Structure formats: C-alpha cells, structure tokens
C-alpha cells in the first residue's frame, strides 16, 4: 500500500518539455498512475499520443483546458473525469491563464 499527497506529488513534477511536467505516483504490472501538468502556451504541441495497450483514466485536479480526440475538443475543468480507450490518439492543452493538472491512470488491457 502507498499513500501520496497531491501537494507532495506536485512538488516533485519533472520537466518533460516546455509545456509538460509529470510525476509518477504508483506503478504496478497492470497500471501506472501519476500527475501530469500542462502549462499554457501560445500554441500547444499538435502531436497526439496513443497508448496501444492501455486505457487512460484522467481526473482534472486543477485548472482548465481541453482534451482533443478525432478533431473534437472537450472542455476540461476541476472535477471532470475522462476515459480514453486504448489505441485512441489524443492530446491535452491548458487554458490561457493557468496550468491544467490531471491525475491519470494508465491501465493495461488485453
């Protein structure tokens, strides 16, 4: 068993790019969970990510932004939870004024 405070995980975010920071919180054979933070940018990276063998579940912790799937944009705000099936290309972007912070789980599916 492991307990993590979100405030503690936020302090341990590591830079992935100018736009993205992340922190792994939990990891097992079938799943990984953590925090990911997107900074506001004038133009977000249009590259989409695809997890071929993992479903994604995200919970918006702080900030606002959007999720893009198949050219459709879905607004994200604190309290929003989303499920992205494996193999679905997607990307996230923060709104204009503050970071978009998500708690995510990548769940290996067969």
Regions found by a protein language model. Name each.
Residues 86-110:
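Ligand-binding loop in jelly-roll beta-barrel domains
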Residues 71-86:
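Short acidic-glycine-tyrosine-enriched beta hairpin
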Residues 28, 52-53, 60, 85, ...:
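A short, compositionally biased micro-patch
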Residues 27-29, 68-72:
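Short strand-coil-strand connectors
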Residues 14-48:
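A short glycine-rich, His/Asp/Glu-containing loop-to-beta-strand
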Residues 57, 64-66, 73, 89, ...:
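Structural motif
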Residues 38, 50-67:
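Short, conserved beta-strand element in jelly-roll/cupin
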Residues 49-51, 83, 90:
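Histidine-centered active-site/metal-ligand motif
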């Amino acid at each position: 068993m492991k307990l993590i405070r979100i405030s503690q995980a936020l302090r341990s975010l590591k830079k992935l790019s100018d736009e993205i920071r992340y922190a792994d919180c939990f990891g097992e054979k079938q799943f990984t969970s953590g925090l990911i933070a997107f900074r506001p940018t004038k133009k977000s990276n249009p590259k989409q990510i695809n997890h071929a063998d993992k479903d994604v579940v995200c919970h918006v912790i702080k900030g606002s932004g959007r999720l893009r799937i198949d050219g459709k944009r879905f607004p994200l705000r604190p309290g929003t939870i989303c499920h992205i099936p494996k193999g679905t290309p997607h990307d996230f972007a923060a709104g204009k004024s503050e970071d978009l912070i998500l708690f995510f789980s990548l769940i290996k599916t067969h």
